[in-house]
Amino acid sequence: MNNFLEKRLKNIGIKKKSPSKSIANYLPCVLSNNLIFVSGQLPIDNGKIIYPGKCDLDLTESEIKQSVELATINMFSNLNEIIINQKKKISLIKCCNIKGYLNCSDKFENHPKTLNYCSDMIVKILGKKFGSHSRTAIGVNSLPLNAPVEIDGVFSINF
C-alpha cells in the first residue's frame, strides 16, 4: 500500500512529479500519528508558476483549471513522498480536508466552482469513499510567486 498513490496516479494517467521543495523555512509535509498535513502547494512546473496572476483578471478558465489541477498533483506528490518513506505498511489513505486560496479581485465569486477542480481530482485519485472531504475556498489579494492558487490538505492514514 505504500506505493498505492504512485500506482493510482499512473493508472489514471497522471505523470509522477518530483515533490516540491519548500521555498522558505517549513516542511512540505508533516506526519503526526495518523494525520498527514500537506503545506500549501502552488501550480509549479519546472520551477515556475505555469500561469501567474489573478484568477479572474489574468487567466482563462482553462488556465485556472490547469493551475488548480497542477497544485493538486503537487500536493499528492508530497503526500506520496512521505507515505513511501514509512516503514509500516499503510492500509488506508483518506482525504479529510483541503483549503484552496485563490488569488483574485474583490469581484470574483467562483470560489466553489474553481476549487471543484481540486475536489474532483482528489475523488478521481482516491475514489468517492476515501476522496470525499470537507473544504474551504478563500479569495485572497495575493499569493507567493504571484500564483493564482495555493492548495493545502489534511489526510489520514491507517497502518
Regions inferred by a protein language model and the residue ranges of each:
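Short, polar/acidic, helix-capping and beta-turn segments at strand->helix junctions
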Residues: 1-159
